[in-house]
């Protein structure tokens, strides 16, 4: 009796695993965010877009990495500032309390790219996601 129950147990275990739903990453973002919703519109990057940082000095350093990267890969020189101006498309790093250390929220509209986090780790991961969402043309050396 024991010899028959062991194989039946393993078959049952395998069948339980077969019922799990596969998660498909439609956006080619790694790691796949917990939630993601596609919106209409595009944000157009140019040298007039300021980078606004409302966070610690360490986050300012992370934001300056964005400036350096965009200058290197796209020839765009974005200027850091502490002030957000209305009706000026901007990239904003905004610190809020209460999020997990590596958590972030990335929001992109035609007027604003905003990375919100509580810790530098979250800002770093949000920026890595933003890099993955940039069009491939940005990474071309020909301009």
Set out the residue ranges of the language-model regions.
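Bacterial Sec-dependent N-terminal signal peptides
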Residues: 1-28
């Amino acid at each position: 009796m024991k010899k028959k129950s062991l194989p039946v147990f393993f078959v049952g275990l395998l069948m339980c695993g077969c019922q799990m739903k596969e998660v498909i990453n439609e956006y080619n973002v790694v790691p796949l965010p917990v939630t993601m919703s596609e919106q209409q519109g595009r944000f157009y990057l140019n040298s007039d877009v300021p980078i606004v940082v409302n966070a610690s000095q360490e986050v300012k350093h992370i934001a300056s990495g964005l400036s350096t990267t965009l200058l290197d890969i796209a020839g765009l020189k974005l200027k850091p500032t502490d002030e957000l101006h209305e009706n000026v498309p901007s990239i904003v790093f905004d610190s809020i309390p209460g999020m997990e250390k590596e958590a972030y929220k990335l929001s992109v509209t035609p007027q604003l790219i905003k990375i919100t986090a509580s810790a530098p780790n979250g800002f770093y991961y949000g920026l890595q996601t933003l890099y993955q969402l940039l069009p491939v043309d940005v990474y071309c050396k020909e301009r």
